[in-house]
């Protein structure tokens, strides 16, 4: 999730001849397009990286804006950040080739069973019911094993069964010694090196191993739509093209699939993996929904060919649906995604969606209940579970979010929810605080987490 441009920057850029259409981007750091919206629409600042054409005073349907990435927080000023051991030197070969920095074998596994979809619920270690969990994107980037163990201790003690964390960390140059990264995409040689060293995938190894020991199940996205921790743009810098072309660029897709193979094969036999996610919040602004749909169809089939043991999900925000639509931005297909269409892909095992009312410009938080039930209806019709995999409010963690939890818990088609995001005190200080963070042991933890788990 990325931050997007200020109103001051918009005025400094100046007017551009072409007007931006409804829900289009009209400002943001590094943005060079139009800043004037079509009649009836106004350019609204959402964050430092993104301003959007939203309905003006003449427009009557409910407003919805979207902070493109409210849940990504970086602990440092670099795009790949967080410390570890010195990176190994990278090796590379011909264009679009992928090499591995060290040899590696799959990590050993412990007892436990693979998570399955069973009707409209998940079966986890023999139990078929509703589950609660959380997100902690930063966990594989920690270098102190005791910190990782402590996180899993707290999750286990609280009864949170599912954890979503990043399975990607892409860079375009070898970072400073002591920085974790998983892939190096070198623009000077158009080659990619997968880092399986002590400051690479071995950090993810430890997370998977610790999850096994604690009986926690992991959801792992394999690339980021946003620039945080490299994302799709890290591929583009090395192999060319544009963000909208990422999904169809043959060189990029071959590199992406090579990374998928390396990671999925590494943990294919681990019962700690709940599911692989194609990406975090895939978007293709202005594209036909066929672009993401075709990519998701091909990629999910590829993952299943490598690993029939684990489920696959899209990792999408859940945009683009007609059920209960109020005509607002999240219900539209403007970002190139069609939730119902993607849900029907044969190798997609369950539906996922996210919810951030404040960042979407929604002032009535009860709107979130409609968002939950809209997706649940589609999941129920498809015969697949629905996972409410990201949600939150800045600073206020115990009002609307608790109502959303109750709606999810009592709605047919819903199988689990994961709040954004988990926090605790580590050996280096507090884990990242993006104002959505709910810290272990606080009063917010009691009302938003412990009380929620007790209701299940």
From Swiss-Prot:
Its EC number is 3.2.1.78. Residues 79-110 are annotated as: Disordered. GO terms for molecular function: cellulose binding; mannan endo-1,4-beta-mannosidase activity. Residues 19-54 form the CBM1 domain. Residues 79-113 are annotated as: Ser-rich linker. Keywords: Carbohydrate metabolism, Glycosidase, Hydrolase, Secreted, Signal. Residues 114-456 are annotated as: Catalytic. GO terms for biological process: mannan catabolic process. Substrate binds at residues 166, 280, 356, 420. It catalyses: Random hydrolysis of (1->4)-beta-D-mannosidic linkages in mannans, galactomannans and glucomannans. It is found in: Secreted. Has a modular structure: a carbohydrate-binding module (CBM) at the N-terminus, a linker rich in serines, and a C-terminal endo-1,4-mannanase catalytic module. The genes for catalytic modules and CBMs seem to have evolved separately and have been linked by gene fusion. This is Probable mannan endo-1,4-beta-mannosidase F. It comes from Neosartorya fischeri (strain ATCC 1020 / DSM 3700 / CBS 544.65 / FGSC A1164 / JCM 1740 / NRRL 181 / WB 181).
């Amino acid at each position: 999730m990325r931050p997007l441009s200020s109103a001051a920057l918009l005025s400094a850029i100046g007017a551009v001849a072409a007007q931006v259409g409804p829900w289009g981007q009209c400002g943001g750091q590094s943005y060079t397009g139009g800043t004037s919206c079509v009649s009836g629409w106004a350019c609204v600042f959402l964050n430092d990286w993104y301003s959007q054409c939203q309905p003006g005073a003449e427009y009557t349907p409910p407003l919805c804006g979207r902070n493109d990435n409210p849940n990504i927080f970086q602990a440092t000023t670099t795009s790949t950040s967080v410390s570890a051991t010195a990176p190994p030197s990278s090796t590379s070969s011909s264009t679009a080739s992928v090499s591995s920095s060290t040899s590696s074998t799959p990590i050993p596994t412990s007892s436990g069973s693979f998570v399955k979809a069973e009707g409209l619920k998940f079966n986890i270690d023999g139990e078929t019911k509703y589950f609660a969990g959380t997100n902690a994107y930063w966990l594989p980037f920690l270098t102190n094993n005791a910190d990782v163990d402590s996180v899993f201790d707290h999750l286990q003690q609280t009864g949170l069964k599912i954890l979503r964390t990043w399975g990607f960390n892409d860079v375009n140059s070898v970072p400073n010694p002591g920085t974790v990264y998983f892939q190096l995409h070198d623009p000077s040689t158009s080659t990619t090196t997968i880092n399986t060293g002590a400051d690479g995938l071995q950090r993810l190894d430890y997370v998977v191993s610790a999850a096994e020991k604690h009986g926690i199940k992991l959801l792992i996205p394999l690339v980021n739509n946003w620039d945080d921790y490299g994302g799709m743009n890290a591929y583009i810098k090395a192999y060319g093209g544009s963000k909208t072309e990422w999904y169809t660029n043959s060189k990029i897709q071959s590199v992406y699939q090579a990374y998928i193979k390396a990671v999925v094969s590494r943990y294919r036999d681990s019962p700690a993996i709940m599911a692989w996610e194609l990406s975090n919040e895939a978007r293709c602004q202005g594209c036909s929904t066929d672009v993401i749909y075709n990519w998701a169809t091909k990629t999910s089939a590829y993952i299943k060919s490598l690993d029939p043991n684990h489920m696959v999900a899209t990792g999408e925000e859940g945009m683009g649906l007609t059920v209960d639509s109020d005509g607002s931005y999240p219900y539209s297909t403007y970002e190139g995604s069609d939730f119902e269409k993607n849900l029907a892909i044969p190798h997609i095992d369950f539906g996922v969606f996210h919810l951030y009312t404040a960042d979407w410009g929604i002032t009535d938080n009860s709107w979130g209940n409609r968002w939950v039930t809209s997706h649940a209806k589609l999941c129920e019709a498809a015969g697949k579970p629905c996972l409410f995999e990201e949600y939150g409010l800045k600073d206020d963690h115990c009002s609307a979010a608790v109502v959303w939890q109750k709606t999810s818990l009592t709605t047919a088609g819903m199988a689990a929810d994961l709040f954004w995001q988990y926090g605790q005190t580590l050996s280096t200080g507090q884990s990242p605080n993006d104002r959505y963070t709910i810290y272990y042991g606080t009063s917010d933890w009691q009302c938003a987490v412990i009380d929620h788990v007790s209701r299940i």
